UniProtKB/Swiss-Prot annotation:
Domain of life assignment: Eukaryota
Note accompanying the cofactor annotation: Binds 1 zinc ion per subunit.
Binding-site residues for ATP, renumbered to this chain: G307, P308, P309, G310, T311, G312, K313, T314
Required co-factors: Zn(2+)
Organism for this UniProt entry: Schizosaccharomyces pombe (strain 972 / ATCC 24843) (Fission yeast)
Name assigned to this protein: ATP-dependent zinc metalloprotease YME1 homolog
Residue segments, region Disordered: 152-182
Cytoplasm as UniProt keyword: no
Length: 709
């Protein structure tokens, strides 16, 4: 079976089909797959046609493809294609194996006229003739023409038999003035010979799928991004290691900060007298190192300052440098951590090198736990490198440098337990100094220090503020003074009064006042009785701390508060004092029950009950203050106690709380008149001091006039 390559012109693009000549029929294009391909690739998918028009074209195309030897079927298809698809008529007419008749010739002639293919017209007329008669030929050299015409097989000779009528019709249709076309080879004949030799190659353009185009674009963008990332990374590493970054930005942010003229002295640091005494030895060592080394002794070179935040560790280090009058190099622990491996160790070396050049000097690293945490196998390499370099420099310079020009290393941290043992061992940090929270005398000294440049009113008693700020650090006290000064300035006052200081303290302890909170008169009265119960029990209970202030002004989540102040800071408490503490705590709930009855008590006492339960539990399980339990510590073993022992512990806690509640209720019943007066005064004024509460309890009726004046 022979195969012939047929060019099919479909809408300006050339496609090629192989058609086989079967030994049973000799019919061309008899494969149903080829027919379907012709239909779907040609007219049916043409854009801009009505769907019904497309279906009609597809129908006639199927009929024409199924009857390739029937010229009438071809003519019907040409008729449908004549208006919109002249290229398709020309392409199909010039295809070998397609039957023709006079009607097909007319449609072909009309299609050529529309496309103005005059050369193709004359050549294809000669191609359709069955014999080369000189009488009917319009060319002067038939041999030259026949040389360019491809030979047909015997199967196609029967399909091209009606060419004289085509020649006659073409000659009659041409106008008289039209000259005879020259014998030029038609494009169709050249096209039919495409692919037959190397001189006439077939150019095939493969249309890529849309997914392939997108994937190629994505690969290009991804490759460009990766390449750009590595280029920028290399440039940043080069700029960091070569110092170009600092030159371009003109910054020394990560360089050791050196201060020579430090004005801080030990007199500026208050409330930490013990820490100052230990650091004074370091100052004397920096001033005269030979005085301590003449007998072979060595003073510590590394000092670790520990303690809660805000206690003055940084100020102590600056005071050491200021007293010794030596250069002071400061860096934070977080400044050693960078994204590049090795930068932290490099900065440690630079810090110690700069300090040695200026010796005697002081190196201070704040928040030392940022680089000195305990090491483990899971740590990143750069973290271990920074700590290792710090360990080497700490142990190295103390042995090799000149004793006449020492370098003292001071570190500060709030979490000494997190530091690596190799860092805190003797030889690196020889001395550990704890900087605690100040006691009442220390707080008073700090308040006096921070109010040196603040004008105070005549009514200000800083000792009362110091007694009421237990647990405040130096930074908290400085903030208290600053807020009071700002509040007084806002109120156009000429000096800071005691009321301004109390407002600032209450704001820090309890939060801002909620003056806009809507409270019904009933709830306000109940809150006044609740706070009055606390204050009254504190006034009439032996060993209880005296009430300092009572208020029903909402602050934070609290609707009111009664504050008691100790005379001094206490580290231990007696059993009587703990029982008095329980009675005062239960006074608020007892006052509610006394006024409204047991069924009208509220949930406002939940915080009081929680505190009282904690005190009673510690009395039983930690302090050995229970007669039935005895002097036994059970807090650490509560989970391992037997059910009977645990029940006994809970029973003792409950007994202490119930006894305290009954004592408070009995006291308030005996002082019901004073309770009513105290609650009424709180409703009227919302705030009572200790002196005002004493006057109300004694029946002073001039309180309103004195308070308003």
């Amino acid at each position: 079976m022979s195969r012939v390559l047929h060019p099919i012109f479909l809408f300006g693009k050339t496609s090629f089909l192989y058609s086989g000549c079967s030994k049973f029929g000799g019919r061309l294009f008899n494969n149903s797959i080829v027919h379907g391909w012709l239909r779907t690739r040609s007219y049916a998918l043409a854009s801009g046609l009505h769907p019904l028009r497309k279906q009609k074209l597809a129908h006639f195309e199927d009929l024409a493809n199924a009857n390739m030897s029937d010229p009438y079927m071809q003519a019907k298809l040409y008729k449908e294609l004549a208006d919109n698809f002249p290229e398709a008529i020309i392409s199909r007419y010039e295809t070998q194996g397609v039957a023709r008749n006079s009607a097909c010739d007319r449609y072909y002639q009309e299609a050529l006229r529309k496309k103005s293919w005059s050369r193709s017209l004359s050549n294809n007329i000669s191609l359709s003739q069955s014999s080369s008669s000189p009488a009917t030929s319009s060319f002067s050299d038939p041999k030259a023409f026949s040389a360019g015409v491809p030979k047909f097989t015997s199967d196609t000779s029967s399909t091209v038999s009606s060419t004289p009528s085509l020649n006659h019709s073409l000659q009659n249709s041409m106008p008289p003035s039209t000259p005879t076309p020259p014998p030029v080879w038609a494009p169709t004949i050249v096209s039919s010979a495409l692919g037959t030799s190397s001189k006439t190659p077939v150019y095939v353009v493969v249309d890529e799928p849309r997914f392939t185009k997108f994937f190629r674009i994505f690969k290009f963008i991804a490759g460009l991004s990766v390449a750009s990332y590595f280029v920028l990374l290399g440039m940043s590493i080069f700029a960091e290691t070569s110092g170009l970054n600092n030159i371009m930005t003109n910054t020394t942010e990560q360089e050791p900060m050196e201060e020579r003229a430090i004005n801080v002295r030990f007199s500026d640091v208050q409330g930490v007298d013990e820490a100052k005494e230990e650091l004074e030895e370091i100052v004397d060592f920096l001033r005269d190192p030979t005085h301590f080394t003449r007998l072979g002794g060595k003073l510590p070179r590394g000092v670790l300052l520990t303690g809660p935040p805000g206690t003055g560790k940084t100020m102590l280090a600056r005071a050491v440098a200021g007293e010794a009058n030596v250069p002071f190099f400061f860096m934070s622990g977080s400044q050693f951590d960078e994204m590049y491996v090795g930068v932290g160790a490099k900065r440690v070396r630079e810090l110690f090198a700069a300090a040695r050049k200026q010796a005697p000097s002081i190196i201070f690293i704040d928040e030392l736990d940022a680089i000195g945490q305990k090491r483990n196998a899971r740590d990143a390499a750069h973290m271990r490198q920074t700590l290792n370099q710090l360990l080497v420099d700490l142990d190295g310079f103390s042995k090799n440098e000149d004793l006449a020009h020492p370098v003292v290393f001071i570190g500060a941290t709030n979490f000494p337990e997190s530091l690596d043992p190799a860092l805190t061992r003797p030889g690196r940090f020889d001395r550990h100094i704890h900087v605690p929270l100040p006691d009442v005398r220390g707080r008073l000294a700090i308040l006096l220090q921070h109010t040196r440049h603040v004008p105070l009113g005549k009514d200000v008693d800083l000792s009362i503020i110091a007694r009421g700020t237990s647990g405040f650090a130096g930074a908290d006290l400085a903030n208290l003074i600053n807020q009071a000064a700002v509040y007084a300035s806002k109120n156009l006052s000429t000096a800071v009064s005691m009321r301004d200081l109390e407002w600032s303290k209450d704001r820090i302890l309890m939060g801002a006042e909620r003056k806009s909170a809507f409270i019904t008169p009933e709830n306000k009265l109940m809150t006044a009785y609740h706070e009055g119960g606390h204050a009254l029990v504190a006034l009439f209970t032996k060993n209880a701390m005296r009430p300092y202030k009572a208020t029903i002004m909402p602050r934070g989540s609290s609707l009111g508060m009664t504050i008691s102040l100790p005379d001094m800071d206490k580290d231990s408490w007696t059993r009587e004092e703990y029982l008095a503490m329980l009675d005062v705590t239960m006074g608020g709930r007892a006052a509610e029950e006394l006024l409204y009855g047991k069924d009208k008590i509220t949930s406002g006492a939940h915080n009081d009950i929680d505190k009282a339960t904690q005190v009673a539990r510690r009395m039983v399980t930690e302090f050995g203050m229970s007669d039935r339990i005895g002097p036994v510590s059970l807090e650490a073993e509560m989970d391992n106690l037997s059910p009977a022992t645990r029940a006994l512990v809970e029973s003792e806690i409950k007994s202490l709380l119930e006894a305290s509640y009954e004592r408070s209720l009995s006291l308030l019943k005996s002082h019901k008149k004073e309770l009513d007066a105290l609650a009424t005064a709180l409703v009227d004024y919302e705030f009572l001091t200790a002196e005002e509460m004493n006057r109300v309890v004694k029946g002073d009726r001039d309180l309103l006039r004195n308070k308003l004046s």
